[in-house]
């Protein structure tokens, strides 16, 4: 490859935010494509046709002069639930999509149109098999993301669910076996990548998920945050606890609800220790299958009047909640790499999170927040009491969190690291005479 020519990268994914709606993988791919294009990289985007109304963000990507779009239909099955959410779909339609999308990447590689393939999850299954059968030597980078198909971690692990996901596991492992480099999004995730994908640690490279600080800052509207409080009946003096995420069981929102109930009323039934504990509200941003159960739970626990469920919001409204929050809590039972936590830190919010997935790589206890054992109501309640009682310290913690993001988790930093990984793989292939 000519060192002076731009890199030509195929990005293969089942979804991205601007085309298919929000989600952790979707948002990551969206940011990745935008920052690759901004770096001068030529991108071949292989994914599903757009399912959203065309907007300025979508047009900016699809109409970019350095991007070619290769839509691959996602053939799901009537009556089997929403696309990409049921176990049956994930283990049939998704690998089939990955076979077809990967074959498109293989054709582009064989035609000399791309230098490297960067796949997400099982979306490069077809390319992985082609490399093995046809000796295609265009390098493959694989990001397996959260690896929920392997059953998760800790309390959310389900042996039965893992068994049901066996076909998808095999597809992702085939992609990993063919990859030149497997990405772990955090140092803490490396052992899980090695174990789940049955690979060697030497083949794993840490490239963190990142946030776009310019976007966060552009949405940092103090006035809109005040309006959010006013609209939802939250006074400026109330301590606002924020959580953001899909309302799934593995996010641990039920654990947080029970912990807040303990904060609201001491275990002995006596008056809470701190008067501030009487003056808090919990805002939950997101939607999902556990919404009704959570509404019922907070009412049963006696904190329904303190809790606001916003549903899905626009990016501007989500960032407004970050800006006006006093504390961000992410009680997840399993996590790959939490973009919501990074966004909260980018907005200078102190964080309480659980010791799972990549969260310990982000939240420094006593510096930018607190870490607790997943699923422990008592431990979480104790830390919340501690946080509410240290309002002056929270601002210092929030600023420390912002510094951590600027140093390690901003796209300006991460894209340079990723481009270096690409170039190293291409140089290695050229040295071996493979491309």
Per-region residue spans from a language model:
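Conserved acidic donor-binding segment of nucleotide-sugar-dependent glycosyltransferases
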Residues: 365-366, 370-377, 386-392
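Carbohydrate-associated surface elements
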Residues: 188, 210
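A short helix/loop element that forms part of the nucleotide-sugar donor recognition site in Leloir-type
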Residues: 57-58, 217-234, 269
């Amino acid at each position: 490859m000519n060192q002076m020519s731009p890199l030509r990268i195929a990005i293969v994914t089942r979804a991205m935010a601007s085309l298919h709606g929000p989600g952790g993988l979707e948002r990551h791919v969206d940011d990745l494509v935008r920052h690759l294009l901004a770096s001068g990289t030529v991108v071949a985007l292989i994914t599903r046709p757009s399912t959203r109304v065309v907007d300025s963000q979508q047009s900016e990507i699809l109409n970019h002069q350095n991007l070619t779009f290769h839509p691959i239909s996602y053939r799901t099955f009537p009556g089997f639930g929403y696309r990409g959410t049921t176990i049956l779909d994930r283990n049939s339609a998704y690998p089939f999509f990955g076979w077809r999308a990967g074959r498109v990447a293989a054709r582009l590689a064989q035609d000399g149109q791309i230098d490297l393939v960067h796949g997400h999850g099982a979306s490069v299954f077809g390319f992985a098999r082609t490399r093995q059968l046809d000796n295609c030597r265009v390098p493959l980078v694989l990001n397996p993301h959260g690896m929920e198909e392997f059953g998760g971690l800790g309390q959310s692990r389900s042996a039965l669910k893992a068994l049901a996901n066996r076909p998808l596991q095999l597809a992702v492992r085939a992609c990993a076996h063919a990859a030149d480099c497997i990405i772990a999004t955090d140092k803490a995730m490396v052992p899980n990548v090695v174990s789940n994908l049955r690979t060697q640690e030497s083949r794993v490279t840490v490239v963190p998920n990142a946030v776009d600080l310019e976007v966060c800052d552009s949405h940092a509207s103090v006035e809109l945050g005040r309006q959010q409080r006013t609209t939802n009946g939250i006074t400026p003096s109330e301590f606002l606890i924020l959580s953001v995420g899909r309302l799934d069981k593995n996010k641990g929102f039920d654990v947080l609800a029970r912990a807040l109930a303990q904060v609201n009323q001491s275990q002995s039934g006596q008056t809470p220790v701190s008067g501030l504990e009487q003056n808090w509200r919990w805002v939950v941003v997101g939607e999902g299958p556990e919404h009704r159960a959570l509404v019922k739970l907070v009412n049963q626990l006696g904190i329904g009047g303190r809790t606001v469920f916003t549903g899905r919001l626009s990016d501007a409204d989500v960032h407004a909640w970050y800006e006006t929050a006093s504390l961000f809590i992410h009680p997840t039972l399993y996590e790959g790499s939490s973009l919501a936590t990074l966004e909260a830190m980018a907005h200078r919010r102190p964080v309480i999170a659980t010791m799972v997935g990549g969260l310990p790589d982000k939240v420094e206890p006593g510096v930018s927040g607190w870490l607790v054992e997943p699923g422990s109501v008592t431990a979480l309640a104790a830390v919340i009491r501690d946080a509410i009682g240290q309002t002056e310290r929270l601002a210092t913690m929030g600023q420390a969190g912002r510094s951590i993001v600027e140093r390690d988790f901003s796209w300006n930093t991460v894209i340079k690291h990723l481009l270096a990984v690409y170039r190293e793989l291409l140089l290695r292939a050229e040295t071996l005479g493979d491309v």
